[in-house]
């Protein structure tokens, strides 16, 4: 449609001729209430209104537009009133568990109940075409998981009890939940869309969108992108005729928007160079033909850019920059009611000064008559002054001021427009609330800057000389002025408060009735034909070249008016264009008709035009072969390398990819590449001493210099976006971590610096912590506390009901260096603080646990643990726990609701070993998992969990501990666990029998080198995306040999069977989720690599250089999804980085076909991992049969974006001995049975009764493995009988009857857990490690060894300082200094795979796990 300004119909001012007044003033009726009022609402097109008292919860109803009010006494303790927006007779009143619904505008109500309270975040979802179909959402559980709740549904308006729709939902809504979405279509009447928890995960990165047509008896996950489903769903909303779903990438705040018009076909919305981020976009009140989105263009000031989509919601173009927003995401954007295309916005005129210097915003108002494509100034009639208005709905009246910018609200006056915003005039001095009635023939306003006793009204369109006043007889502070939503009534309601006699204030509702002012009702003849009806009529005009077209996607406007051009910015080729040698293609002219525009004929500006192929943003040409690029650098060592992996790659757009790596050499030069090492450039000109990638967001990276200057980027260094800020003080000199990051607020930083440290050995020098909420910019640093060892943000995505501002610090008491540490906490940047613990040894903050170790008066250590950061519980250990002194620890893993620690038993150099212990689910009880596990001097432990598959782990043990204690060299063997060992083949890769074959597993097993002996400690056996695949370097025999004797082995079945793939020691990496595996000789000069495309069946050679170079490492992106790799090494005196690109191979030109409905139809098989010691049902692993997607070996295609490899839990298995482990205080015997540790007494089984249990079981030596989901069968944890707790005998008898079968009650551990720390009994893996063997089964270790007599103690993440000469050892996240030439300790979140950002080490570990450190692994500059 083409809008002609002078002929626009006004939204509300129908401009009917004023009727002759029969009375001098409207009638007034006042009703007084004791409490403040909320939820004042009219039923549409009626005179019935509802209102609620805030204090009492009472609901009142008025049938006569507010003249008289009556309490609805049956509606008790209502929490809120929610009207059905699609039916003016229906409303809900929600209570705690009892609720009420009306279908006759509140005259009668029917009650119903739900189990829990309604959600505070949109508790009701209405069906737009059936008023009986309603969804009720219960309050979400946000403590231990991201906020997930339960939803009920009704199809009969709650005549019957509501039924459970789905549990574990983020949100749900009807497909027909918007008036225009699926309008007029008969299908999908019962369709519901829900964002649910992941298949087998509660993490927000795994949230899925599910669609059901039968109330979730069955459900499907829609295909969103490139024929694949998409995880990480964050939100969805209906916008006119569109449904928009937002997807959040892991380790990033970046979002992708997917749009559909039918719930069946989804498209990835494209914003050109724009980027959508979490909490940084607002979907605005859009038109019928397009979606309008305001996107924050600055992270730390509320300024945005307005984008408008094309008609299918796919392509968005920027219309205006510097729109004004507030911190809550509300945008100064208003549409003139009932008229498509007229938009008013406020822009920030001095945006650059606001962003750079924090200047005060200068706001200006602009209006558009073409749906936001072009904007112009607001003009006052008879004046050349600009008008600026405060944002307000309806906007044919507004409070504002003339001049250069928008002033304060209280300095504004009331203006009115009678031509839909084209021109404006002053109505009343001072700011007023206002409302329209009788289609605009009556305008009412009330003073809004304080108390007033007058109400103003105009019957002549609000012109300044037409206003009259109504004397109320008392002063009122106006809160709200309203009428019917369509402004057709002559009755208004004014709500406010007035002073009471005797003090205080009372609340009043005043009805203003203008009906008696008219002698007669206006008839048709009284209306000017031009303004006869507020219903718009349309007349198509001839298309105008300048007014009816806008720039198409990929083009940006240049010039204005007739000189306006649309210049190519990013041209995307149409499908199949520019192939087969074509030099041109038919593409966009650069123009498109404005969405919804109904012009005809005239200009044909949007017709396709011929364009040259080389104008398009083409992906690099495919070479049909592997390519390599060698880059040389000055220096002797690479100090640091980090991948900044983008998690929102769009597989549909081959140009929308970057693989960014940052690297630091020992020349103190930082380099950056965006194409995985094909082209490098200097990141910054200054010398850099450390690189800090953001712990939680891969888009952020920081380059620290030797001064206070810090360079940083918020988008992976793209588009020359590296800026700088000044830190408050120099970095600390105490080897402490310098930067700490917030998991949610990406711009919140804690800087650990050194104060008064300019002079060497200054006595005044001490550490000081500072915080910035603006990423260090704009002099935003505020001091926290001084004399601190560590400060960290406490908030996490789930499990901690704390403020985002909460910070824990370890501070020296009385601010004295060397004084004992105390743990202090604050929610307001330490304006107030709380001392949590004194005499602190160490604190560890992880994703799930917070562990604090303190020293007692007798020099023993006490351990306290918390899940919620509020309540701590003490951990108790068996008798004689501290008899064996601990000297060091290494944190191995805490990714499965328990902490794995290695406790050093022998700390002597080159003779280190210790025990692995495992905590229960709340971190308060530790039990033995494996003895005599090997460790090296740097603190690394030979222990690694397999990635992508739970429960499989490999460790190396020292088998001659007695000799080692006497000074002998360590002899090591490898153990693997799938729960209780694994089977091995007896043939080598060449088909020959091993020399040791037939000698039994003691003499003939496979042993592999772990962390402690790897040349590059950043390598891993497995990949998070190549399920079931592992590579290792080792040998077959009686014990682990040297690296020089080692060969390279591979397994494709999670360690059940292994085969030798190459003689000698190789480094490896996985690409495209296992589609390609590349290996290279480690630490030797070489000119080639080997690669396999069929999971190791065939190995091919690729020569990447004409001369040999020494390769020290091979890397790829942390997710192992790329087809690019980097080799790192040296060529003579130069450093070299070699890019290997496999994407050109013909085998990867097609994207793999994955259909979840028929998973084996396309390019994938379903793989089921097996248990090596389950003769009856080998497919049962942890009590269930799990199915995983694995690409077929002969499939010639690429996986692309990360796949959710877990397809399904096919079934649960019956319980067997393999589903149980030894209970607390029990140890495994050589025959496999569990026996009470000598000297300990049985626990009192009745102890659970004092904690609220109604029954208890006899003590069992066994407990179920936490990962097991087995059902029935041999339940070893219920070997005894169940008994009633005192006082529950009768209930027990009724429940159990003759069957004697009862609810399982876990035997809790012998310590008192405080509130908030539940009894999730997570179990010990004692004795579950079996040799990687070729022969028969045997005991895993000697239980008579003195190292098994008592579970060895360790403090999670804490240094056990009880030895005479304590040895401080960092956790796994410490990078081995010197291995890669570094001169600095490791970062708290950096692993041996530190430059592979986000990658796990000993297991798939949350970034938080890096918090667990000893003193010597901290930072130094």
Curated annotation (Swiss-Prot):
Record-given protein name: Vacuolar protein sorting/targeting protein 10
PANTHER family: SORTILIN RELATED (PTHR12106), SORTILIN-RELATED RECEPTOR (PTHR12106:SF27)
Function: Functions as a sorting receptor in the Golgi compartment required for the intracellular sorting and delivery of soluble vacuolar proteins, like carboxypeptidase Y (CPY) and proteinase A. Executes multiple rounds of sorting by cycling between the late Golgi and a prevacuolar endosome-like compartment.
Endpoints of the signal sequence: 1-21
Protein family: Belongs to the VPS10-related sortilin family.
Keyword rRNA processing: no
Glycosylation (residues): 288, 922, 1212
The entry's keywords: Glycoprotein, Golgi apparatus, Membrane, Protein transport, Receptor, Repeat, Signal, Transmembrane, Transmembrane helix, Transport
Transmembrane segments: 1297-1317, 1350-1370
Membrane topology: Multi-pass membrane protein
SUPFAM superfamilies attached to this UniProt entry: Oligoxyloglucan reducing end-specific cellobiohydrolase, Sialidases
Domain of life where this protein originates: Eukaryota
Single GO BP term: Golgi to vacuole transport
Any one Gene Ontology cellular component term annotated for this protein: membrane
Gene: VPS10
Gene3D superfamilies referenced in this protein's UniProt entry, alphabetically: 2.10.70.80, 3.30.60.270, YVTN repeat-like/Quinoprotein amine dehydrogenase
């Amino acid at each position: 449609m083409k809008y002609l300004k002078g002929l626009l119909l006004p939204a509300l001012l129908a401009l009917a001729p004023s009727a002759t007044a029969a009375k001098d003033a409207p009638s007034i009726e006042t009703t007084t209430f004791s409490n403040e009022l909320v939820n004042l609402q009219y039923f549409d097109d009626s005179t019935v209104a509802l209102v609620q008292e805030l204090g009492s919860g009472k609901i009142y109803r008025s049938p006569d537009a507010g003249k008289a009010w009556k309490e609805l006494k049956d509606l008790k303790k209502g929490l809120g009133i929610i009207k059905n927006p699609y039916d003016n007779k229906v409303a809900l009143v929600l209570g705690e568990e009892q609720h009420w619904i009306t279908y006759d505008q509140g005259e009668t109500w029917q009650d119903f109940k739900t189990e829990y309270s309604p959600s505070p975040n949109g508790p009701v979802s209405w069906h737009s075409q059936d008023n009986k179909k309603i969804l009720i959402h219960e309050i979400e559980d946000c403590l231990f998981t991201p906020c997930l709740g339960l939803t009920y549904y009704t199809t009969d308006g709650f005549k019957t009890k509501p039924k459970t729709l789905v549990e574990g939902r983020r949100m749900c809504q009807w497909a027909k939940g918007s008036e225009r979405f699926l309008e007029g279509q008969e299908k999908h009447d019962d369709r519901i869309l829900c964002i649910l928890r992941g298949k087998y995960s509660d993490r927000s990165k795994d949230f899925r969108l599910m669609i059901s047509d039968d109330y979730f008896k069955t459900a499907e996950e829609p295909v969103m992108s490139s024929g694949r489903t998409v995880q990480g769903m964050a939100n969805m909303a209906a916008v006119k005729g569109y449904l928009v779903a937002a997807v959040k990438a892991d380790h990033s705040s970046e979002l992708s928007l997917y749009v559909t018009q039918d719930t069946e076909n989804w498209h990835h919305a494209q914003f050109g160079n724009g980027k959508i981020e979490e909490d940084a976009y607002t979907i605005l009140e859009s038109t019928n033909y397009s979606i309008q989105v305001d996107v924050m263009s600055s992270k730390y000031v509320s300024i945005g850019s307005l984008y408008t989509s094309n008609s299918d919601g796919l392509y968005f173009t920027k219309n205006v920059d510097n729109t004004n927003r507030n911190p809550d995401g509300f945008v100064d954007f208003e549409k003139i009611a009932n008229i498509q295309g007229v938009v008013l916005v406020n822009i920030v005129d001095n945006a650059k000064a606001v962003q750079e210097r924090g200047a005060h915003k200068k706001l200006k108002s602009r209006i558009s008559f073409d749906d936001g494509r072009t904007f112009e100034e607001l003009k006052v009639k008879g004046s050349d002054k600009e008008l600026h208005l405060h944002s307000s709905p309806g906007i044919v009246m507004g409070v504002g001021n003339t001049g250069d910018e928008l002033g304060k609200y209280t300095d504004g006056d009331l203006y009115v427009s009678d031509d839909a915003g084209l021109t404006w005039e002053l109505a009343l001095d001072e700011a007023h609330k206002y409302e329209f009635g009788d289609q605009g023939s009556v305008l009412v306003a009330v003073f809004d800057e304080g108390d007033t006793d007058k109400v103003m009204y105009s019957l002549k369109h609000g012109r300044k000389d037409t206003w009259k006043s109504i004397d109320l007889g008392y002063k009122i502070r106006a809160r709200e002025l309203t009428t019917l939503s369509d402004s057709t009534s002559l009755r208004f309601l004014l709500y406010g408060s007035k002073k009471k006699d005797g003090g205080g204030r009372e609340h009043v509702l005043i009805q203003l009735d203008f009906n008696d002012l008219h002698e007669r009702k206006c008839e048709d003849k009284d209306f000017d034909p031009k303004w006869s009806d507020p219903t718009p009529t349309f007349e198509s005009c001839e298309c105008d070249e300048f007014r009816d077209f806008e720039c198409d996607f990929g083009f940006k406007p240049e010039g204005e008016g007739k000189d306006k051009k649309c210049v190519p910015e990013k041209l995307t080729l149409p499908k199949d264009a520019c192939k087969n040698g074509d030099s041109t293609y038919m593409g966009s002219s650069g123009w498109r008709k404005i969405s919804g525009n109904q012009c005809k004929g005239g200009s044909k500006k949007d017709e396709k035009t011929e364009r040259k192929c080389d104008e398009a943003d083409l992906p690099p040409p495919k070479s049909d072969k592997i390519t390599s690029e060698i880059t040389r650098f000055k220096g002797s060592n690479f100090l640091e390398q980090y991948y900044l992996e983008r998690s929102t790659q769009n597989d549909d757009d081959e140009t929308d990819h970057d693989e960014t790596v940052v690297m630091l050499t020992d020349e103190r030069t930082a380099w950056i590449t965006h194409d995985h090492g094909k082209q490098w450039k200097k990141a910054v000109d200054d010398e850099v001493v450390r690189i800090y990638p953001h712990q939680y967001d891969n888009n952020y990276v920081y380059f620290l210099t030797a001064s206070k200057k810090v360079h940083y980027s918020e988008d992976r260094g793209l588009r020359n976006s590296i800026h700088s800020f000044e830190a408050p003080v120099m970095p600390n000199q105490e080897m402490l971590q310098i930067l700490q990051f917030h998991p949610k607020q990406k711009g919140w930083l804690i800087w650990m610096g050194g104060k008064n440290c300019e002079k060497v050995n200054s006595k005044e020098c001490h550490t000081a912590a500072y915080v910035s909420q603006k990423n260090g910019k704009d002099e935003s640093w505020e001091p926290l506390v001084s004399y601190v060892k560590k400060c960290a943000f406490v908030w996490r995505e789930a499990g901690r009901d704390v403020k985002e501002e909460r910070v824990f610090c370890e501070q020296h008491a009385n601010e004295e260096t060397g004084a004992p540490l105390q743990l202090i906490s604050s929610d307001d940047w330490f304006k107030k603080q709380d001392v949590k613990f004194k005499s602190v040894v160490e604190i560890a903050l992880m994703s799930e646990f917070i562990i604090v170790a303190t020293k007692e008066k007798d020099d023993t250590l006490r351990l306290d643990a918390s899940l919620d950061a509020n309540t701590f519980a003490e951990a108790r250990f068996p008798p004689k726990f501290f008899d064996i002194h601990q000297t060091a620890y290494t944190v191995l893993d805490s990714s499965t609701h328990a902490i794995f620690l290695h406790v050093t038993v022998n700390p002597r150099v080159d003779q280190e070993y210790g025990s692995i212990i495992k905590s229960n689910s709340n971190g308060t009880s530790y039990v033995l998992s494996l003895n005599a596990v090997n460790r090296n001097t740097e603190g690394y432990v030979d222990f690694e969990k397999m990635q992508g598959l739970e429960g499989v782990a490999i460790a190396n043990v020292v088998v001659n501990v007695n000799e080692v204690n006497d000074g002998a060299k360590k002899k090591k063997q490898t153990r693997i666990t799938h729960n209780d060992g694994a089977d091995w083949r007896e043939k080598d890769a060449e088909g020959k029998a091993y020399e040791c074959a037939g000698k039994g597993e003691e003499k003939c097993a496979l042993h592999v080198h772990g962390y402690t002996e790897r040349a590059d400690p950043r390598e891993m056996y497995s990949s998070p995306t190549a399920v079931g695949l592992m590579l290792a370097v080792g040998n077959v025999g009686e014990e682990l040999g040297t690296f020089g004797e080692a060969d390279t082995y591979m397994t494709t079945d999670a360690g059940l069977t292994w085969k030798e793939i190459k003689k000698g020691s190789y480094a490896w990496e996985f690409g495209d989720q296992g589609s390609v595996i590349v290996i290279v000789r480690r630490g030797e000069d070489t000119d080639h690599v080997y690669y396999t495309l069929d999971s190791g069946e065939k190995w091919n050679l690729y020569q990447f250089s004409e001369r040999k170079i020494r390769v020290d490492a091979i890397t790829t992106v942390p997710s192992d999804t790329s087809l690019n790799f980097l080799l790192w090494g040296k060529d003579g005196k130069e450093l070299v980085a070699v890019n290997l690109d496999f994407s050109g191979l013909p085998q990867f030109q097609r994207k793999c076909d994955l259909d979840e409905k028929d998973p084996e139809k396309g390019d994938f098989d379903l793989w089921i991992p097996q248990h090596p010691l389950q003769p009856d049902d080998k497919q049962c692993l942890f009590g269930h049969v799990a199915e995983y997607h694995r690409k077929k070996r002969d499939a010639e295609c690429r996986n692309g974006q990360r796949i959710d490899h877990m397809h399904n839990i096919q079934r649960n298995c019956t319980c067997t001995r393999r589903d149980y482990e030894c209970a607390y205080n029990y140890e495994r015997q050589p025959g496999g049975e569990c026996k009470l540790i000598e000297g300990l007494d049985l626990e009192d089984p009745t102890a659970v009764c004092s904690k609220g249990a109604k029954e208890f079981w006899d003590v069992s030596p066994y407990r179920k493995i936490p990962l097991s989901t087995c059902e029935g069968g041999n339940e070893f944890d219920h070997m005894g009988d169940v008994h009633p707790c005192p006082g529950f005998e009768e209930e027990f008898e009724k429940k159990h009857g003759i069957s004697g079968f009862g609810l399982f009650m876990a035997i809790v551990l012998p310590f008192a857990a405080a509130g908030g720390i539940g009894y999730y009994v997570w179990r010990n893996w004692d004795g579950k490690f079996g040799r990687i063997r070729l022969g028969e089964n045997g005991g895993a270790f000697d239980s008579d060894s003195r190292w098994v007599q008592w579970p060895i103690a360790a403090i999670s993440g804490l240094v056990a300082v009880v030895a005479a000469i304590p040895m401080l050892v960092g956790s796994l996240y410490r990078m081995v200094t010197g291995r890669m030439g570094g001169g600095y300790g490791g970062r708290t979140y950096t692993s041996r795979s530190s430059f592979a950002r986000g990658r796990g080490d000993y297991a798939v570990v949350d970034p938080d796990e890096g918090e667990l450190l000893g003193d010597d692994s901290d930072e130094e500059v």
